[in-house]
Design a protein with these regions (language model features):
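Elongated, amphipathic alpha-helical interaction scaffolds
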Residues: 1-303
């Protein structure tokens, strides 16, 4: 079971907390700094916050929503999201969400294909599967774009996917060399730190991040909402973990009884569906159900 502690600093590993910190216009400088570090080929001077909702592209009865959506001073749109738990179809989901704004571009151009340059940055608290695992032993950022296979010629900048696999970032605190690595570490451990570490206190950027994420500095109502959110997160995560553990146990038992691997897979699949139905009846959000069970949002909406 997951024991979520509420410490001195906001736990920005959580998607809603991340959005609350980096989505505030008062903290725009922090988001600009983070994006310039992750997207090292860009030089973002300013950005404009955009709506994260996409009208007309409902999944069941639920609108599609991004964690953070901004436009840079150069006109490039950047979408930022945090994903805590793995999903069996995560890469397909990422491509699907990358396509949604393109449809919006076409609508805005009234049928003309005037597509905006767009980058989707996903901070993942897990590891993706890659064909060449050796390359990823010391690398946690992957970049995908639309290019010709042999020559590398660029087809379009309408879809660029950047995955930061924080599940691969293992550097200890004392070995962090730069602000990018310090950001990665904070995205993993901010909520656990009792104070700003000495190695980070030397960085003006890190001092700023720690200042705005100190829980006691929050307005009273915002602090109350944070405590409520983290408590609810703990309760939901524990329910989900229990359901997943039960589902795995039952699936394994059925597989042994039938003597076939198919039996185990089928048992696990049925338990995931059962857990999803139960969570849905309790009013748990589709996004959390999807993260917990590995089912797609479309599959959950159909239950």
């Amino acid at each position: 079971m997951e024991d979520i502690q509420i410490g001195r600093y906001l736990d920005i590993s959580r998607d809603r907390v991340f959005k609350n910190v980096f989505g505030k216009r008062a903290n725009k400088d922090l988001l600009i700094a983070l994006l310039n570090l992750v997207l090292d080929s860009m030089d973002i001077v300013d950005l404009e916050y955009l709506s994260g909702e996409f009208q007309g592209f409902d999944i069941g009865s639920r609108q599609s929503r991004m964690d953070l959506r901004v436009k840079t001073n150069a006109g490039t749109e950047v979408i930022v999201e945090v994903q805590v738990r793995d999903q069996h179809d995560f890469k397909d989901r990422a491509v699907y969400y990358a396509a949604l704004p393109i449809l919006e571009d076409v609508e805005a151009g009234r049928g003309r294909y005037m597509l905006r340059d767009r980058i989707i940055v996903s901070f993942l608290h897990f590891q993706l599967e890659h064909s060449e695992d050796a390359h990823w032993a010391d690398e946690c950022r992957s970049v995908y774009s639309l290019r010709e296979k042999v020559t590398g010629e660029k087809l379009s900048d309408a879809i660029n996917l950047v995955f930061v696999e924080l599940g691969r970032f293992k550097k200890p605190l004392e070995s962090l060399d730069n602000d990018l690595e310090r950001f990665y570490f904070c995205l993993q451990h901010m909520g656990e730190l009792p104070e700003i570490p000495d190695g980070m206190a030397e960085s003006e950027l890190m001092r700023r991040l720690f200042d705005v994420t100190e829980v006691e500095s929050l307005p009273k109502e915002e602090k109350r909402k944070y405590y409520s959110y983290m408590t609810t997160e703990r309760d939901i995560r524990n329910q989900i973990d229990f359901a997943v553990e039960q589902g795995e146990a039952r699936g394994e038992a059925r597989g042994r009884a039938e003597g076939r691997a198919e039996g185990q897979a089928e048992g696990e699949a049925k338990e995931r569906l059962k857990a999803a139905r139960n969570f849905k009846s309790l009013g748990v959000s589709v996004e959390i159900i999807s993260k917990a069970t590995g089912l797609s949002e479309v599959e959950i909406a159909a239950l």
